[in-house]
Amino acid sequence: MNIVLDTNCLIMAISAQNEYYKVWQDFIDGKYILCITNDIIEEYTEVIARNLSPLISDYIITAILNRKNVRRISPTYAFHLIEADEDDNKFVDCAIIANAKYIVTHDHHFNILKQIPFRKVDIITLKKFLEEL
């Protein structure tokens, strides 16, 4: 299954002390396909470096980029579906183009997608995603 993982959810999943660590372990084990773009990788890098450390950021990004279950997407169109936080659109664009089953997020800005009769991308929390794994 193709998924897009919001940055805050990635940060929660990479901590071995967090209840969502299994999401990261299942990614490493190849149980789902993580869809990314260059913009998403840049955000992952910046936020992990700022919140944890540059060394951890390098380790995590290298781990992501070296996995076979990563699908790199090059969006050719920006849909601009989220107006409340334009920066979140990179995740939506990736999910639409990758035909992802889910965007895994806790960000309420993505809830607008539930009301758009456009190409349906389901929004799911880490807890619900973990239950599916």
Language-model segments: residues:
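Extreme N-terminal starter segment of soluble prokaryotic enzymes
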Residues: M1-N2
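Alpha-helix capping/helix-boundary segments
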Residues: C9-L10, I40, H109-F110
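Active-site neighborhoods of divalent-metal-dependent phosphate/nucleic-acid chemistry enzymes
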Residues: N69-I103, H108, I112
